[in-house]
């Protein structure tokens, strides 16, 4: 973590991540149950739509293209990544304040600093902005395997209302 953010993380795209998982899944003898959280939930939805899983569970899933939220908590939590003025080529590393609001909002304030020090990691802004791009488009009219969407009522990054829209 002390060496982060690695500038190469700024080059990572959702398409690159999806390509990796497609390769892994196509090499399996049978289709697995896919499980993902946040951006991983969106990845589960995309891979299921492509027929690469037997079923899926998406926990507080990032939204596919066209599913949006204007809820304050969503905008505040995600703005450092999705802001038009944010440099997509630079990885995002949350500040303590951003981490407290976005990730550790359900734990006691006394524990937030240690949670930040243990769990805060940089992320690719390109991946974070991907739900607004065609790579994250899902045709909801196409049949796909069963998908369970789970929403956290206190989640600031992906509010439950956004999961219901999804």
Residue ranges and their predicted role:
Residues 92-127:
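Conserved alpha/beta-hydrolase catalytic His-Asp/Glu region
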